Amino acid sequence: MCASRLVLLLGLLLCVGAHLSSGQHWSHGWYPGGKRELDSFGTSEISEEIKLCEAGECSYLRPQRRNILRNILLDALARELQKRK
């Protein structure tokens, strides 16, 4: 009888402890994980960037083949120079 009461009490404490430990204080304007509301940032700036990207003027979305090829060649030359030393 005493063991069953102890198990019941431990189960109840486990449930209450699990419920209380999952609580989180959120500051004003913050969501879980430290994320802020998007309205607090300059949404006009974000929408302007999106409009530019939709028009096809995003240079960071286009592959820079010349730069990639140049970087590969420079890395290969640097490795060859290190091997010779």
Curated annotation (Swiss-Prot):
InterPro entries with a match to the protein in the record: GnRH, Gonadoliberin
Glycine amide found at: 33
Cleavable signal peptide: 1-23
Function text: Stimulates the secretion of gonadotropins.
Record's protein name: Progonadoliberin-2
GO molecular function: gonadotropin hormone-releasing hormone activity; gonadotropin-releasing hormone receptor binding
Record family assignment: Belongs to the GnRH family.
A Pfam family the protein falls into: GnRH
UniProt keyword annotation of Secreted present: yes
Subcellular location(s) of the protein: Secreted
Main location: secreted
UniProt keywords, alphabetically: Amidation, Cleavage on pair of basic residues, Hormone, Pyrrolidone carboxylic acid, Secreted, Signal
GO cellular component: extracellular region; extracellular space
Tissue and organ expression note: Midbrain tegmentum.
Location of Pyrrolidone carboxylic acid modifications: 24
